[in-house]
């Protein structure tokens, strides 16, 4: 049985796009960032959904491009004393939870996530308290405070396996915050899942009718879909998976044309993985609607070259992530529980986020 907890639909105010830099300014900030990384004993870790020039700079300077959990784990294994996290705020918090001894900086602390914003800790706590018989599973795309309330934290690549495991133990689930991913794991597992009603502003916009028209234009194309997308879109996919899983699918699928339903930032690493293939964004407009995100997270777009340089140079309250130690310890419990479960299954945990 699956129930849906309805909360008021939210229209999140989008941040202003960064002022574009000209070629000379880009070159200036790239060199400045390289210098500051050395001066601050820092490493740049970037999410798959940041702009291509940021991902390229992370690779060029010895950092990494990955999902949120792998970003934090890379930082843990790297000797640098400072992590510059190019992503959204919960990613910086996750890095700090797993690396308390390191300084964690971000280009801006105002880079939000609609899944995080759509799951405020007080409301979520009250919801969980009203269903005390359920095991609480939260997606990685949540605040440290929400993680601290959970029994498990999960990434998209291991979500189905974990819910199947909990279902086999007879446990009923609270799932938060993404309703589409919750619906996907419920359908795959058959578990009793009560979903919080959140959504990613990017994936929520993918449209079935528009995708069908695009598929008609490219009948030989494979469709790759992130499970944060609506179920009707997921049902059209040739491959469904997390960011890392979609990149792997792009490599292994025989089709030379790919229609990709996730943030277009992933195209940088996906094209690296299969340079001989042609990639198209799945449509986010149509069916009587215009796109708001247009397949790119507006908060990810805040991680520009100028902002990264300012984060490294200024630090302080505008850029440094702090997580209360008691809260960090509480959030670490469900995170470690997930990692231990993954190790038992001999799975490599790589998920969106």
UniProtKB/Swiss-Prot annotation:
Short name of any one Pfam family annotated for the protein: NadA
Catalytic activity: iminosuccinate + dihydroxyacetone phosphate = quinolinate + phosphate + 2 H2O + H(+)
GO cellular component, one term: cytosol
Annotated positions binding iminosuccinate: 47, 68, 139-141, 156, 226-228, 243
Cofactor-binding details, from the entry: Binds 1 [4Fe-4S] cluster per subunit.
Cofactors: [4Fe-4S] cluster
The protein's Enzyme Commission number: 2.5.1.72
GO molecular function, one term: quinolinate synthetase A activity
Compartments (UniProt record): Cytoplasm
InterPro entries hit by this protein: NadA, NadA_sf, Quinolinate_synth_A_type1
Record's keyword terms, sorted: 4Fe-4S, Cytoplasm, Iron, Iron-sulfur, Metal-binding, Pyridine nucleotide biosynthesis, Transferase
First-listed, main subcellular location of the protein, grouped into a coarse class: cytoplasm
Listed pathway(s): Cofactor biosynthesis; NAD(+) biosynthesis; quinolinate from iminoaspartate: step 1/1
Domain of life where this protein originates: Bacteria
Gene Ontology biological process terms from the UniProt entry: 'de novo' NAD biosynthetic process from L-aspartate
Annotated residues for binding of [4Fe-4S] cluster: 113, 200, 297
Keyword hit for Transit peptide: no
PANTHER family according to UniProt: QUINOLINATE SYNTHASE, CHLOROPLASTIC, QUINOLINATE SYNTHETASE A
Protein family: Belongs to the quinolinate synthase family. Type 1 subfamily.
Function: Catalyzes the condensation of iminoaspartate with dihydroxyacetone phosphate to form quinolinate.
Protein name, per record: Quinolinate synthase
